[in-house]
A protein has these predicted regions:
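N-terminal, charge-rich interaction modules
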Residues: 1-58
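Long, charge-patterned amphipathic alpha-helical coiled-coil/hairpin "stalk" segments used as oligomerization
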Residues: 55-131
Length: 131
């Protein structure tokens, strides 16, 4: 068992939301909620599965942001975690309540623009976000 710090990679001007959910349909539901709440929003979303092949599911409206979210999700590698990269000019305050109200979303760890490190706990059987 060990701890690891994973730095979130992103341009300085971008905001992101890091959270935890419990169902593979999370990606589709977050995507639909965002485009409904903020028409024209630019975002990339990635979700780490926690069982089976432990795939990373992704979606979004901007290919570069989708790839950035996927890269960060792969680095974090914690089951049931998701990362939502918001395009320049879009802020968590505009979508945070929408995301929190999605039934699959269990919680939000953070929603900053600041440089961020995520503390990961690895048991050898899986990884989890400590904070």
């Amino acid at each position: 068992m060990e701890f690891e710090s994973v730095s979130i990679k992103k341009p300085e001007e971008l905001n992101f939301i890091l959270g935890q959910a419990h169902f593979i349909k999370t990606v589709e539901d977050i995507h639909e909620a965002l485009v409904t709440a903020v028409p024209g929003i630019k975002f990339g979303l990635a979700f780490c599965e926690a069982s089976g092949a432990c795939l990373i599911r992704s979606s979004g409206t901007d290919e570069a942001l989708i790839q950035l979210a996927r890269e960060n999700a792969m680095n974090i590698g914690a089951g049931h975690s998701f990362i939502l990269m918001l395009g320049e000019g879009y802020f968590p305050i505009n979508v945070l309540n929408t995301v929190k109200n999605i039934p699959e979303v269990c919680g939000i760890f953070c929603a900053p623009a600041n440089p961020t490190g995520v503390i990961i706990y690895d048991t050898g059987r899986g990884r989890g976000i400590m904070g």
